[in-house]
Amino acid sequence: MAGAQDGSFHGDEDCQMPITLDRVREIFKGLEGGDGSAFFDHVADDVDWTVMGTHPLAGHYQNKTAFIAGTFAKLGQVLPNGAQLRAEHLIVKDDQAVVELHSFATAKNGMRFDNRYCWVVYFRNGLIVRVRAYLDSAMVTRLFQENPIPGTESRN
């Protein structure tokens, strides 16, 4: 997987087909139900996923398992019904997409967790291989301060 100067990936170019707007929309539909498994079927096991910011979910995750454990699993402990994420705006070019998402959720303490996200997504052979995710860091911090995960209070 070689990174070009523009930040895109151009490995296996002979197999690479541009991703379409309809395909990206279909993939992201898998996040609307709150569990995400349909979405994660389209994420490479060795995905390189960076959640920007200085909050309890921020970090550089070097595979799908680590990303899910560090983000979705933690959110599942404080959002009883999970976070329903809806893709609202998409820009797709070649093997890249920029996806604006809006989450709808209620925390254990009743706090509304309606966050906004921007994910810069890179595809290879139809799978998501790299993501840079941006979100409201202050809202995430507040969520975990008001709804601590047992045993992690001192780390949030």
Model-based region annotation:
Residues 32, 51, 108:
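Short glycine/serine/threonine-biased micro-segments
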Residues 24-27, 38-43, 47, 67, ...:
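Hydrophobic pocket/interface hotspot
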Residues 9-16, 73-156:
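A beta-strand edge to alpha-helix "cap/lid" segment located at domain peripheries
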Residues 2-42, 147-156:
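Short, low-complexity N-terminal intrinsically disordered segments enriched in polar/charged residues
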Residues 44-94:
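A solvent-exposed, acidic/Ser-Thr-rich amphipathic alpha-helical stretch
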